[in-house]
Each structure stands twice: as C-alpha cells, then as structure tokens.
C-alpha cells in the first residue's frame, strides 16, 4: 500500500539523514469532528502511527464528550509545553496560549500555582499535569469550569469527583518519552517542515554587572521553556517556577511587555 511504502521510505531517509526530494506522509482517520474552527467548516482529525511523547492519540479518554477541533488544538498546545518539563508541572491553556504554568512539590501545589497565575483566563481552559491527580486537587479543579483535564494518572477518589461533571473531558496520558517527530505546518500551496524545538542553551553568559544566582538561573530556563510556546511577540514574567504575566500575540514587543507586566502587577 502507499502508506506502507511511505513508511519504509521515511525510515531510510531518517536513518541516512537524507532530505527527500519528495515527501510522502501517511495519516489515518482518527475522528470526524462535528465542525472545524467555525461551525460552517467541516473537519477531521488524522493521526500518524508514532510514539510521540504525550501524543493525544495515545492518551485514553476516561470521561466526557468528544473533542472539538479547537479542543484538539488547545490540548496539543498544552502537551507541547508539558513535554518540556521533568519536574511536577501544571499547564493551563486558552486559545493555544498558556495562561498559567507552574511547578510544584506536588500536583496540588503545581495546579494551585498555575491557577493563581491567572485565575480569570483559566476559566473554560485546558489543564495538563505530569503527575497523578489526587482527591484534593480534583476538588479544586471541580470548583471551576474546565473543558479538558489531561494527566498521567488519577486517584479513584479524584475520578469520582471529576466525573460528576458530565461534559468534562478527562484524559489519561501515556508516559513521557524523548521522542519528537518533526513539526509540519501547512502553508498555501505546500508545507513547512522543521525539527522540534526542544533545545536550551548549553551555557549562559551574564552580560550585566549584576550576576544571576542559581534561583534566577532556574527561572530563566523555566521562562525559556514557556515563552517559546507563546505566540509572538511573546513576553513572559516568571518567578520561582511560576508564570506571573504572559503577553502574547501583539504586533510589537512593547505591547506584549505591557500586558505581561500589567498582569504580573506588584509581583513583577
């Protein structure tokens, strides 16, 4: 079949680090969606057979109604950010931009800090966490309207609480790995292909008289992991492993900076 031939060709191209003159991609139909980005648009969800880290198609839906086109985009955006972190982290997303990202010593702490980062925007959002959701966390999640919760696991008591909301989509994620497929973006008349942006600098050079301490260095790395997933122009204000303000998608940096600093307020 064409998909089988494409898989073989792509395997050898990757093995030999070749850039193919012709690129054949094979996807299988996962779902026919109710509609696309707008109600008048037809839409479908196709997936590749791969072991991509935190890939949505490898997650198990435990509860809730089917995903929409926009839900899938938001969930994927949340998982892209979550895959950056090894430590316990919670990511909250609205309209494909993070509204709160935070680390913590527990899932409850990480979720609480992500919520506190922007308690307004998280309403109706998507939450992803790389740990087990317990009863205490579930009760806090249940207190607001969320579209989707994605986590690596759930306590039985947590599921009892969360499933009381009929329409809440609950997903159990596959284990994290370091597999990252190339990113493909459609453009008019073609596609763009690039390697996944999963690298941070090996070392940093302080160019100011005041040198950063270890805590500040960790915040720099935390901020870099988040900001690359924010729509440009992107500004992120962070402290102690928590976003305090996020300015996204403005046509100039000054506008994004004003939004981020205004959101962070006195904490900036």
Regions found by a protein language model. Give the residues of each.
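ATP-dependent carboxylate/acyl-activation modules
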Residues: 3-268
């Amino acid at each position: 079949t064409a998909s089988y031939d494409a898989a073989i060709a792509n395997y050898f191209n990757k093995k030999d680090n070749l850039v193919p003159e012709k690129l054949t991609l094979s996807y299988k139909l996962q779902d026919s969606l109710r509609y696309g980005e707008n109600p008048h648009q037809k839409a479908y969800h196709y997936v590749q057979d791969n072991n991509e880290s935190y890939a949505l198609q490898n997650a198990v839906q435990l509860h809730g109604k089917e995903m929409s086109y926009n839900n899938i985009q938001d969930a994927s955006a949340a998982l892209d950010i979550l895959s950056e972190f090894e430590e316990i982290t919670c990511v909250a997303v609205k309209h494909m931009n993070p509204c709160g990202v935070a680390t913590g010593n527990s899932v409850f702490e990480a979720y609480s800090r992500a919520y506190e980062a922007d308690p307004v925007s998280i309403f109706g959002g998507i939450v992803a966490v790389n740990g087990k959701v317990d009863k205490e966390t579930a009760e806090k999640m249940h207190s607001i309207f969320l579209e989707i919760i994605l986590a690596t696991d759930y306590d039985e008591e947590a599921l009892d609480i969360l499933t009381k909301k009929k329409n809440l989509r609950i997903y159990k994620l596959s284990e994290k790995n370091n597999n990252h497929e190339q990113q493909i973006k459609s453009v008019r008349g073609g596609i763009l292909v690039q390697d996944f942006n999963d690298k941070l600098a090996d070392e940093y050079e302080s160019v100011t008289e005041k040198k950063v301490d270890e805590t500040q260095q960790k915040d720099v790395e935390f901020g870099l992991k988040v900001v690359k997933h924010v729509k440009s122009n992107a500004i992120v204000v962070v402290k102690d492993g928590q976003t305090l303000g996020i300015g996204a998608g403005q046509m100039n940096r000054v506008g994004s900076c004003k939004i981020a600093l205004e959101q962070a307020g006195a904490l900036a």
